[in-house]
Amino acid sequence: MSYKRLNSDLIDLIELRNELHAMAFNDPQYDDLEDDLHDYEDTFNRRYQGIIAPILIRIHKKLAPEIPHLIPTAYVANHYEYLAETDTYETDGTSGVVLENGAGNNFRLTFVPNPTRLLLTSSKDMQVVWSENQPDDETK
């Protein structure tokens, strides 16, 4: 598995989502960009479903076994902030897939690039539950 390619494709997807997020609905280019984004999401899901699904299954099984895993793009936030000085992306933690545990706590699971990783966020905490730097580790 080329995590370098996954990271690059994730960044391309994020850039498309950011571009659409910044565009007004009445912009003449909005519909075309939205179509391009959906096409890219379909390609991303086809390309990475078989690779990412086992990771997501492990995470869901450990953190929220009653909630089935979704397609990879469901875990990509709608908007990211790019920080050029560190070449990283941040999200505000309000996007991604919601996981609820039995104690009534809500968490969100979100993909972030550079390096590719899955973040588990709550209103109080954020932790990396999977990273390309430690791909075979058990879910934390």
Residue ranges and their predicted role:
Residues 1-10:
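Short, charge/polar-rich alpha-helical segments
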Residues 9-23, 40, 47:
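Non-transmembrane amphipathic alpha-helical segments
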Residues 22, 76-81, 117-119:
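N-terminal processing/targeting junctions
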Residues 30-39:
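Short, charged, amphipathic alpha-helical segments
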Residues 38-108:
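Long, charge-patterned amphipathic interaction tracts in eukaryotic proteins
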Residues 88-140:
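Charged, polyampholytic interaction/assembly segments that form long, compositionally biased interfaces
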